Amino acid sequence: AKEKEVTFQSGGPT
């Protein structure tokens, strides 16, 4: 998973 994908799974785009 790329950084952007992880951000979305974490909660959303920071």
From Swiss-Prot:
Subcellular location as annotated: Secreted
Predominant place of localization: secreted
Family: Belongs to the scolopendra toxin 4 family.
Official protein name in the record: Scolopendra 5885.28 Da toxin
Disulfide bonds: none
Entry superkingdom: Eukaryota
GO cellular component terms attached to this protein's record: extracellular region
GO molecular function: toxin activity
Sorted UniProt keywords: Neurotoxin, Secreted, Toxin
Tissue specificity annotation: Expressed by the venom gland.
UniProt keyword Secreted, yes or no: yes
Ion transport is among the record's keywords: no
